[in-house]
Amino acid sequence: MALWGGRFSQESSALFKLFNDSLPVDYRLVEQDIVGSIAWAGAITQVGILSEAECQQLQQALKELLGEVEEKPELILASGAEDIHSFVELSLIAKVGDLGKKLHTGRSRNDQVATDLKLWCKKEGQQQLLLLKALRQALLELAERELDAVMPGYTHLQRAQPVAFGHWCLAYVEMFERDISRLEDALKRADTCPLGTGALAGTAYPMDRYKLAESLGFASPTLNSLDTVSDRDHVVEICSDASISMMHLSRMAEDLIFFNSGEAGFIDLDDEVTSGSSLMPQKKNPDALELIRGKTGRVYGSLIGILTTMKALPLAYNKDMQEDKEGLFDVMDSWAICLEMAALVLSGLKVNRENTLSAAQQGYANSTELADYLVAKGMPFREAHHVVGEVVVKAIAQKKPLEDFELKDLQSFSEIITSDVYDCLTIESCLEKREALGGTALPQVRAALATKLAASE
């Protein structure tokens, strides 16, 4: 039975019902719909629609219903109801009879679903924050284990300058901390209660919406009914935050996939996060990381979907908004499993220090140090840059690192070079010089790690 049948002289076609019904998606809002209905029963009691006894009877029946669907969630989809609101209301009527028909007084499914969705976003958002913080902790623990392992840093995927592996870990800590901050901000903006704004013009009953908001755990009520029932900014914003976070996850996955490759051999991944080949018995594939990278596009698609759905909707509510949930639910599911999987990958990751050090010593990563050495001797940097470029050309031709050149050969490029030049060409020197705030010198990395660990306690 539909909640709106009185206006119509014939029933909906089976095809329209299949097309229109949203229960297969919005059943996930059952807890929020029941909690909102319990609060609404209290609100309409305060304005005289229900007696205290009726309110208690309705609220008790709703609590019983919540227990039943938690124990047997299959009851929801088996009901054949149009949507989760219809399921809850019809189930309530089945329990308490005509009294259940009073519950929807002054309420529309428009403010009802807006409330359900915000309650769901608030709850699930808190779970995502916990997962983000767990991933941050996994990175911090990895940084502690492998802080002083030396590896090549890259620009353009070409070896550039040596960095500490702990510095690499802390780079991603910075990214995920921004994700935490963004999501916390989004949840603050979502912390306003839509209930009591009706279909679009507000409710005709003089209820205390501040008290209603407080009863549902919101910071305050919304202030404009037209905006309230048509607002899905919180969905867009959470999908956007998830997309940015998935970008960070995908970048980290890409780094680790490369580090794990036979060509690099920088890290080993645990067997529990890898798989093999059905044909090639030697293969150990980084499937967990590849799936994180793959699921990122899926999350982006949901963000574009909700933006496109909302971009041309007039005030106030439109049925298009029914399409807001499937993408949101998929975003949150995908984001959550990727955060969990990334943390698991990091927990078992081991750095092959000999390989990372060997790679850092190749590719003339100490060229910048030689240029800085010349600057310290009084040569303008642009000239020093040119001189070192010529040295590198000769080094490549002779297939030897800069530190293997004899002094007289280096002096043929500049007479200001003396025997102390070799002190600046070591890997250790390359790291030690980067001691300004944010640099990769080991004391800086240790200090940054200590600060992050203290903040995470």
UniProtKB/Swiss-Prot annotation:
HAMAP family: Arg_succ_lyase
Source organism superkingdom: Bacteria
Pathways per UniProt: Amino-acid biosynthesis; L-arginine biosynthesis; L-arginine from L-ornithine and carbamoyl phosphate: step 3/3
One of the record's GO cellular component terms: cytosol
EC id: 4.3.2.1
PROSITE patterns: FUMARATE_LYASES (PS00163)
Family: Belongs to the lyase 1 family. Argininosuccinate lyase subfamily.
Gene Ontology biological process terms, A to Z: arginine biosynthetic process via ornithine; L-arginine biosynthetic process
Enzyme category, top tier: lyase
Gene Ontology MF: a single term: argininosuccinate lyase activity
Reactions it catalyzes: 2-(N(omega)-L-arginino)succinate = fumarate + L-arginine
Amino-acid biosynthesis as UniProt keyword: yes
Keywords associated with the record: Amino-acid biosynthesis, Arginine biosynthesis, Cytoplasm, Lyase
Main location: cytoplasm
Name the record gives this protein: Argininosuccinate lyase
PANTHER family: ARGININOSUCCINATE LYASE
Source organism (scientific name): Shewanella sediminis (strain HAW-EB3)
Localization (cell): Cytoplasm
Acetylation is among the record's keywords: no
